[in-house]
Swiss-Prot record:
UniProt keywords, alphabetically: Nitrogen fixation
A GO molecular-function annotation: iron-sulfur cluster binding
Gene transcribed to yield this protein: nifU
Keyword tRNA-binding: no
UniProt cross-references to InterPro entries, sorted A to Z: FSCA_dom_sf, NIF_FeS_clus_asmbl_NifU_C, NIF_FeS_clus_asmbl_NifU_N
Native source organism of the sequence: Cereibacter sphaeroides (Rhodobacter sphaeroides)
Family affiliation: Belongs to the NifU family.
GO BP term, example: iron-sulfur cluster assembly
Its biological purpose: May be involved in the formation or repair of [Fe-S] clusters present in iron-sulfur proteins.
Gene3D superfamilies: 3.90.1010.10, Fe-S cluster assembly (FSCA) (3.30.300.130)
Protein name listed in UniProt: Nitrogen fixation protein NifU
Record carries keyword tRNA processing: no
Pfam families the record matches: NifU, NifU_N
Amino acid sequence: MLDETGKALDLFFNPRNAGPLEAADAVGTAGSLEVGDAIRLMLRIEAGRVAEARFLAFGGAHAIACGSALTVLVTGLDLAAARAVTPEEIEAAVGGLPAPRRPAAARAWSALQIALAAYEGRTFVAPEPAPVPAPAAAPVRLLAPKHDSQPRIVRDVPLAPAEEARLIAEVIESVRPRLRADGGDVTLVAVEGSKVRVHLTGACSGCQLAALTLGGLQKRLADTLGRPIRVIPEEKRPLVSIAGAR
């Protein structure tokens, strides 16, 4: 499982080197938009080394994390060293991947090999992926962070409830577009002291992505409000309730 407080979470919410690279010398695309998972890697090469790397990803949180990690891995490498990067190194750079998510690292690796092959005038044929074992049947449960997130800076003067309500709504709205692109969504249910209750739907309600979503949201809220916050998932979605807000 992805570490909700570690590398994958950081790479997902704060992706490195995301966006187009106009001066790219080598471009590799792997995956398919039709199936909802694709990554494009762009490299600027100078004196036989990767001077700059950027990526575009269409798909889930793991595609974004792997693309981000790969650009960091290859920047500064000579072409031989870049070719030698493995899917396992990409997995390690994101803090590990569960078996069903390992194809994200394989796609990022394929995009790298395709880009280098095109630059060098070669043809790269991606190996057939190994079949992913079917996970054992288990009831789906929502995962909540085990502890409050501490803010980077604690506010000397607490915010008024109405101002907190506005900021909480803004933070949640800011993450919804990315979650919707990943096939899920999050909505605010209630704010009760340090507890922020939310309702997850779609892909975000499964146990793998729920931890990633809730952990990142909790940290953002704590930093924004300047006080410890705990985000708790709710099975049902009642009317929004914010204690003290008018």
